[in-house]
From Swiss-Prot:
Gene Ontology terms describing biological process: translation
Gene name per UniProt: rplP
Family: Belongs to the universal ribosomal protein uL16 family.
Name of this protein: Large ribosomal subunit protein uL16
Protein task: Binds 23S rRNA and is also seen to make contacts with the A and possibly P site tRNAs.
Annotated organism of origin: Prochlorococcus marinus (strain MIT 9303)
Organism taxonomic ancestry: Bacteria, Bacillati, Cyanobacteriota, Cyanophyceae, Synechococcales
Record bears the keyword Secreted: no
GO molecular function: rRNA binding; structural constituent of ribosome; tRNA binding
Keywords: Ribonucleoprotein, Ribosomal protein, RNA-binding, rRNA-binding, tRNA-binding
Origin superkingdom: Bacteria
Length: 158
């Protein structure tokens, strides 16, 4: 399972998840991707379960890229412990996900859209957030819509 080799601080505050992903929201390596539709935490175990589901389905057909990394420690107190006496110990690691973030990418010569869609669907079931399957052509359509509407030229009337 994924976790950082070493961190500067062992414990973090939980934080807030506001806004949309400004980084990691475009397809960079493959042709197909799984994009987050809502915010949440994804644990290293959930990432590994999704990766295994996709890998088993595509077998040796293509390549899978994991675009998220669990770098936030979540602490827990032991069961039936009284209040006080400090913060608990780190129990597991999570990746903080915002809407629009690309979670997984898939590509290769033998990967068709149908195979990629089914593999991503199997991965979706392992995740606690809503996700959407996108391809490179879908991304280009979205990127093209960001252009400002053409402004009519101003002519000087005399």
């Amino acid at each position: 399972m994924l976790s950082p080799k070493r961190v500067k601080f062992r414990k973090q505050q939980r934080g807030r998840m506001r806004g949309v992903a400004t980084r990691g929201n475009t397809i960079a390596f493959g042709e197909f991707a799984l994009q987050a539709q809502e915010c949440g935490w994804i644990t290293s175990r959930q990432i590994e379960a999704s990766r295994r589901a996709m890998t088993r389905y595509v077998k040796r057909g293509g390549k899978i890229w994991i675009r998220i990394f669990p770098d936030k420690p979540v602490t827990m107190r032991p069961a039936e412990t009284r209040m006080g006496s400090g913060k608990g110990n780190p129990e597991f690691w999570v990746a903080v996900i915002k809407p629009g973030r690309i979670l997984f990418e898939m590509g290769g010569e033998e990967i068709t859209e149908e195979i990629a869609r089914e593999a991503m669907r199997l991965a979706q079931y392992k995740l606690p957030i809503k996700t959407k399957f996108i391809g490179l052509d879908d991304q280009e359509k979205v990127a093209g819509s960001d252009k400002p509407a053409s402004v009519p030229a101003i002519t000087a009337e005399s």
